[in-house]
From Swiss-Prot:
SMART domains tied to this protein: PCRF (SM00937)
Protein name in the entry: Peptide chain release factor 1
Modification comment: Methylated by PrmC. Methylation increases the termination efficiency of RF1.
Disordered, as annotated region: 287-311
Physiological role: Peptide chain release factor 1 directs the termination of translation in response to the peptide chain termination codons UAG and UAA.
Amino acid sequence: MMEKKVHELLERLAEVEEVLGNPHVYDDQKKYRALTQEHAYLNNLKKSWDEKKDLEKQLEDNQELLKIEKDLEFAEVLKDDIRQLQSRVQELQLLIENLLVPPDPLDNRPSIIELRAGTGGDEAALFVGDCVRMYKLFADRKGWRYELLSCTPSEMGGFKEYVMVLSGENVYRFMQYEAGTHRVQRVPATEAQGRVHTSAITIAVLPEPDENEEIDLDEKDLRIDTYRSSGAGGQHVNTTDSAVRITHVPSGIVVYCQEERSQHKNKDKAMRLLKAKMAEIEQQKKQQELASTRAQQVGSGDRSERIRTYNFPQNRITDHRINLTKYNLDYVINGDLEEITSALVAYFHQEKLKTSREE
């Protein structure tokens, strides 16, 4: 099964190389970039496959030699070579299996992270603030860029809602699995009895549509309202109607932005968020059509799903999807998310791999 799939992809490599050899390929830069990325992926697969076949031939030859070798010293050399060859063949087998799950074209897309306070009132709003800080620090570690789209501060601190954009290498690859319900257990500062309270926030992660991606938004379906922005905690408050709220009437989706002093800039940011939400709806429709097996449904990013618990009294963080529990919440909340996000990427990659093997 694997060999058949590899040969199909190697045939595709020959087709891509033929297209890239045509001088007119540069006329469409978007298509050219996509082809060069596909070529790099397929060429990497070919190199690994060729090396595996060569080593398997060497392994077979050495095993045949060992059967007839009389010299004990040389026989030990052959055995050592066989062990090394077997180890490398296994490595290449795993590498090829992983390569048979093609890279997701969304991996490098800028990601819109939307955090909302849920059950727990002020404590949930404070936790939104904690998570915003956590993701900013994680972005710093990864070398990603950060941009605020909109936020609604809470009177007691934190945020009722916070929307930001992270951009950089593999942003969506790592951040997509943050979508869902995050539960926090801790003793609020106002709790005199020292009782642990449970609160929750929801997080949505939307890959920002590509500039060339067609998002069907009819102007007559949009209601655009302007109003005066409001702030808290000493933030600048406009005296002009610079804040913008856009309603997509057919779907009922509402987005807004008031962070910029310019109405034009606020409208641009609100439109970016609206387009991302509309693209997500289209993507979910496609996923539902394809999701005929559980493996395809895993990791759908359903924001109603409780995915993680942060227990501050025990310094414990648990990701329920992969049964991962760590007692280093103090590090994680300060941006050390690498271990958790990498474990999630590896887990869901294996789920995709299972699906690939079954096809």
